[in-house]
Amino acid sequence: MSGNTYGKLFTVTTAGESHGPALVAIVDGCPPGLELSARDLQRDLDRRKPGTSRHTTQRQEADEVEILSGVFEGKTTGTPIGLLIRNTDQKSKDYSAIKDLFRPAHADYTYHHKYGVRDYRGGGRSSARETAMRVAAGAIAKKYLAGLGIQVRGYMSQLGPIEIPFRSWDSVEQNAFFSPDPDKVPELEAYMDQLRRDQDSVGAKITVVAEGVPPGLGEPIFDRLDAELAHALMSINAVKGVEIGAGFASIAQRGTEHRDELTPQGFLSNNAGGILGGISSGQPIVAHLALKPTSSITTPGRSIDTAGEPVDMITKGRHDPCVGIRATPIAEAMMAIVLLDQLLRQRGQNADVRVDTPVLPQL
């Protein structure tokens, strides 16, 4: 099965299934000398892990990461970093009754046609459980970038019909929704409580921002920074759309409104999301992700079995009514992985480039 590795110089390979014994990752290309321990990775894993509120799946996983290689005496050695997270709360019996059925809007049908065999327990490899390893790997990238003054962080900007205005980064970590507006939290909680009573699910929008990114990252033409970000962010389970900067709002904008004018004091706007011509401009990198509603709901739906016969499906098990609630750390991880990979590529080709034009400050 190909397609399990991302990156050119900083690479992340993941393996493991939702109900397998463990999840693993190999992180290759991390520069040597970075101080690193499991604690550095655990913070983001704790932000993503299930069972932390009544609004997420009640599967209880500690998601405690083990560093198996690539770190000696508290520092990275430049060799591959092996990571492992053990699965401890699988309930595979929840899926035995549907092993020959295709859950609507899941990967069951497509995996079956592609491989001729599939792990039906919790979606197997297609489960969002896999993203735990992305978060662990992304935490390594985030720490390295932080040493260069680059900060990657995200928040929920919409849940279903509820738009969430940005008010403060301080508020994001103070609630289960990663909401930047504390006044919206009661409304979000009430909406999710009603959603559970309706036995339904809903989508969400996540915004992720990288600040302190220097100009010059991105490899035109096919490895443009925005193209790489779209690739990485679209690879996250349930993501159905990615915007950079103003994104689809650009359609209704005029050129006089959309263009980010330059002054000696800095850019006057950031509709481009910090990327011009596929290369970082030095402004904040801004991306938005649209996540679809969870397909695993207890409301009956029509489907077929492996023989092609019609069936009525009710998906059992423990599932997130809104996968977007836990998606913020995943989006941060993927952006950090992309940025570190691009930074190392820029360093490898253009480390000797010197430009007299000053770098504009971020307004």
From Swiss-Prot:
Enzyme kind, highest EC tier: lyase
Pfam families given in the database record: Chorismate_synt
Binding-site residues for FMN, renumbered to this chain: 125-127, 237-238, 277, 292-296, 318
Example GO BP: aromatic amino acid family biosynthetic process
Listed EC numbers: 4.2.3.5
Region entry Disordered, spans: 42-61
Cofactor binding, note field: Reduced FMN (FMNH(2)).
Assigned GO CC terms: cytosol
Top-level taxon of the source organism: Bacteria
Pathway given in the UniProt record: Metabolic intermediate biosynthesis; chorismate biosynthesis; chorismate from D-erythrose 4-phosphate and phosphoenolpyruvate: step 7/7
InterPro entries: Chorismate_synth, Chorismate_synth_AroC_sf, Chorismate_synthase_CS
Family classification: Belongs to the chorismate synthase family.
PANTHER family, per the entry: CHORISMATE SYNTHASE
Function as written in the Swiss-Prot or TrEMBL entry: This reaction introduces a second double bond into the aromatic ring system.
Protein name: Chorismate synthase
Lineage: Bacteria, Pseudomonadati, Pseudomonadota, Gammaproteobacteria, Pseudomonadales
The encoding gene: aroC
